[in-house]
Design a protein with these regions (language model features):
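Surface-exposed peri-terminal alpha-helical interaction modules
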Residues: 1-139
Length: 139
């Protein structure tokens, strides 16, 4: 039977992963909102139902795929019964890499532009960096 310290540590890790997921979702939402406005300036208004299809299929939004995949990986980890230090470190490192200078060029360029264009992206980025730091301390 797991001891209380182990269970508390597991809950800390789970909370950290949930916080990271929430911060990533916020950044994703801000980026989608910004890119929707840009897309609609170029191609005209898009109904909400069609927009979801456009985001998943249109090359204009492909640069967001690494972020979407990272969120999916965290979702899968949150479904696991236990969370390990290595996993928390790996997720924090993958997030830092994605949002850092060594990320994929297509993502980095568009993300840097979004940081310059939209205050909501800046706020989401700050929250994301804070959560990454907290998650690294748990690991």
């Amino acid at each position: 039977m797991p001891n209380e310290q182990f269970l508390a540590r597991q809950e800390d890790r789970r909370s950290g992963l949930r916080a990271l997921r929430a911060a990533l979702l916020k950044a994703h939402k801000e980026l989608i909102t910004l890119n929707r406005a840009e897309y609609e300036r170029l191609y005209g208004p898009v109904p909400a139902g069609l927009f979801v299809q456009i985001v998943t299929e249109e090359p204009y939004f492909r640069w967001l795929d690494p972020l979407s995949r990272l969120i999916i990986e965290i979702d899968e980890e949150l479904e696991a019964p236990e969370h390990h230090d290595q996993t928390c470190r790996a997720v924090a490192a993958a997030t830092e890499k994605l949002f850092g200078p060594q990320s994929e060029p297509a993502f980095r360029e568009r993300y840097q532009q979004a940081l310059q264009d939209e205050s909501g992206v800046i706020v989401a980025h700050g929250q994301l960096m804070k959560v990454i730091g907290q998650l690294k301390q748990l690991a």
